[in-house]
Amino acid sequence: MNIVDQQTFRDAMSCMGAAVNIITTDGPAGRAGFTASAVCSVTDTPPTLLVCLNRGASVWPVFNENRTLCVNTLSAGQEPLSNLFGGKTPMEHRFAAARWQTGVTGCPQLEEALVSFDCRINQVVSVGTHDILFCTIEAIHRHATPYGLVWFDRSYHALMRPAC
């Protein structure tokens, strides 16, 4: 069997564009957040998303204990916030850089996000270095911004909604 090496896999994955998201939580284990593009729809009955999280990440224990999260899909122009949540910046500095509301699950919702999905984690599957978090959506909040943000070919790109 031919196994693809890690660098070849990563180079190939850079060809797949994906929305840029900040995943947040708040609860008994505290408040935390990270940037992720490994997020996708699973089903609409019941409305469910999946989020992939490295078990070695500093935020993993917080999400694992809180069992709630909010997927905040970023708009064009929010690249600095994505970089902040994707780095080693202390949590209080990450959250201080934007305005937040509290969602129905208690998780922080980014006020200027393109869309926010407030969720409960209902199943976790471990694969390799990551946990796949299956998340039932309890509430959705949309913002009227016309521009989305995607990560493609190792850089950010703005997307504009088509005129109807």
From Swiss-Prot:
Description of what induces expression: Up-regulated by the nitrogen regulatory protein C (NtrC also called GlnG) and repressed by RutR.
Gene3D superfamilies assigned to the protein according to its UniProt record, in alphabetical order: Electron Transport, Fmn-binding Protein, Chain A
SMART domains, per database record: Flavin_Reduct
GO biological processes: nitrogen utilization; uracil catabolic process
Highest taxon, organism lineage: Bacteria
Keywords from the named record: Flavoprotein, FMN, NAD, Oxidoreductase
GO molecular function: FMN binding; FMN reductase (NADH) activity; FMN reductase [NAD(P)H] activity; riboflavin reductase (NADPH) activity
Enzyme nomenclature, EC number: 1.5.1.42
Catalytic activity: FMNH2 + NAD(+) = FMN + NADH + 2 H(+)
Function of the protein: Catalyzes the reduction of FMN to FMNH2 which is used to reduce pyrimidine by RutA via the Rut pathway.
HAMAP family: RutF (MF_00833)
NCBIfam families recorded: RutF (TIGR03615)
Protein family: Belongs to the non-flavoprotein flavin reductase family. RutF subfamily.
Protein name: FMN reductase (NADH) RutF
Gene that encodes it: rutF
